[in-house]
Structure formats: C-alpha cells, structure tokens
C-alpha cells in the first residue's frame, strides 16, 4: 500500500474553508472507485510551526491504482476542484511514502467505514528525520529496534506509523514518524525541561549515530478526520 503525504500551504484566513472543501469535495473525488482513502487531515497547532498549514495522508491501493487516480485528474469534477483549491491554498507539496517493515501502519481496509473516535480530536507529533548519507536503512531499523520499544514503555506517545519516501517521488534520505500524543502533561513537562535527567543510552543519544537533523511539528486532527 502507498501513502500520499501532502503539505498544503493555505491562504491566510482560509483554513476553515479549505478544510471544508477537502471534506466535501476532494475526499469524495479521491475515494470514488475504491482505490484510495483519506486517512488523516491535520492542521498545525497554533504557535508550533508555520502559519496556515494543513497535512493530509491518503492511502492508495497500489501503483496501478495511483496511475488510475492521476489519469482522472483531467475529468471535469477534478478540474472544478483545482479551480476551487487554488482560491484557498498557495501551494501543495506531495511525496509518496511506503511503510517501514516494522511500522504499525501497514495496509488498511479501503472499504471499512471510518471509526468514530468518541472523544476530542487527537494531537500528533509529526517528526521528519534526515539520516546521514547511506544510513537510511540503518536509521529505519534503529527506530524500530530502539525508539519504538522506548515509546511503548513510556506510554507518553504511541507510534502510529513510520514511512519512507518511495524512490523517485521525493527526497531519498527522509523518514516520517507519526506519533499520537497520549499524555499531554508529561509532554508539556518535556517541552519545559527538555531531556534533563533522562537516562543515558536512550534514543536521544543512540539516534545521533544515524542522524543529527530532524523537524518536529504538533498537528491537531480535524474533528471529521477519518482516523484519529
């Protein structure tokens, strides 16, 4: 299964209108035919990164399905979407991603109905890491062998998915880690105090063997996002 990761730079003051357009116009277009399904719609939490930005992650059955989806872009309904979208957003940056072998997120049932979260919208930590040249596979393996068990033990975050960029569709040395925030008070303490007093030998130390550059964003799920 493929995952299309899109970052939408929205026109100032148009974020609510853009979200509604994605929900009512774009999502039905993408999901028509059963080859693809919107998984998450996130907005950047205010004050944590760029202004007026949204991120979507869409599951696509396989490369043949992706080809069919691209071929439909010339249809009248898709052209109408394009005209509407460019009144609401300035740019969109996309990449096709594949699940890491150990990633909890693998294939999903494209026909299954969305499950209601039954609570407030979830908050996610969206980490993008850039491993050293030639270290991509080692970095991904270390995330699964060291970092993933560490999060399971601490229960502050739940790793939902680990995705790598499909060849030819974006930056080679790039990994996206999707983590749902389960314990906000502890995370707020981490923001306030950093890693002071944390035991040595954990991921913050071991991870430097594979990369020393990463970017973190706090994302808030839309209330209507199919997955929370």
Q: Over which residues does each language-model region extend?
A:
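Surface-exposed interaction/gating patches
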Residues: 2-15, 101-184, 223-228
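An amphipathic, aromatic/His-enriched active-site/gating alpha helix that lines ligand/cofactor pockets
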Residues: 16-40, 46-51, 59-100, 145-160, ...
């Amino acid at each position: 299964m493929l995952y299309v990761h899109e970052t939408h730079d929205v026109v100032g003051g148009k974020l609510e209108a853009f979200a509604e357009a994605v929900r009512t116009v774009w999502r039905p277009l993408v999901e028509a035919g059963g080859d693809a399904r919107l998984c998450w719609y996130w907005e950047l939490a205010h004050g944590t990164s760029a202004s007026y930005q949204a991120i979507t992650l869409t599951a696509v059955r396989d490369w043949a399905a992706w080809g069919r989806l691209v071929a439909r872009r010339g249809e009248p309904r898709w052209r109408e979407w394009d005209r509407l979208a460019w009144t609401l957003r300035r740019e969109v940056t996309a990449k096709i991603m594949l699940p890491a072998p150990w990633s909890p997120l693998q294939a999903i049932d494209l026909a299954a109905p969305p499950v209601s979260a039954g609570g407030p919208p979830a908050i996610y930590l969206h980490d993008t890491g850039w491993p050293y040249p030639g270290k991509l596979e080692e970095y991904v393996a270390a995330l699964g062998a060291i970092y993933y068990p560490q999060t399971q033990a601490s229960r502050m975050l739940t790793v939902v998915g680990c995705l790598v960029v499909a060849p030819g569709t974006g930056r080679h040395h790039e990994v996206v880690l999707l983590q749902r925030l389960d314990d906000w008070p502890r995370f707020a303490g981490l923001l306030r105090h950093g890693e002071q007093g944390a035991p040595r030998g954990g991921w913050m130390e071991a991870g430097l063997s594979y990369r020393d550059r990463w970017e973190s964003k706090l994302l808030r799920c839309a209330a209507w996002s199919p997955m929370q």
